[in-house]
Amino acid sequence: LDEDGVDAFIIADYGLISMLSGKLKNAEIHASTLLGVYNIETVRILKSYGVKRIIFYANLYLDEMIRIINTFPELDYELVAEGGTCFNDIRQCRLPHIISENEHILTCRSGCVLFDQEDTPQKGKMIAEHPCRVAEVVGIYMAAGIRSFKIEGRTVPAKERVSHIRDLKNYIEQFSNG
């Protein structure tokens, strides 16, 4: 694939990164979110293997990303901006997914009905507020040094995915044009 013009490999395995280190002629190695890049030492190791881009997962706080970017400004940084995340995992859920034996929340943004001890339905309420979309604050991430944004689409209907892409593109252009 390297000889066929592939420009980058997004890799989620340290062993494979180590094996490819220094062997690619054209393609770059990009560190997948699945590697769990959460601190400066991890980035230091990945850089020593020749990784050129770090793809941040949205569960890092902005100040954590900035610390890494400021330590290694020569690397490229990317953020998963939409989709592919569990809001419980990125610190936006207010309750666990399973409330009781009788109640299971399919998504964190779903409404639910709570039951009292006699299994009588109580007032329904939202478990979590709709989270802020990265598109709405993309300028903050761009100012921090993140220049690329991914939109995961496997779990989002096409119609919704298209609107996410359009929104993200518009916000990036607004920030870029001042």
Set out the residue ranges of the language-model regions:
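Residues lining hydrophobic/aromatic ligand-binding pockets adjacent to catalytic sites
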Residues: V51
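Active-site pocket-lining/capping segments in soluble small-molecule metabolic enzymes
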Residues: L1-V37, I55-F56, L62-K150, R154-G178
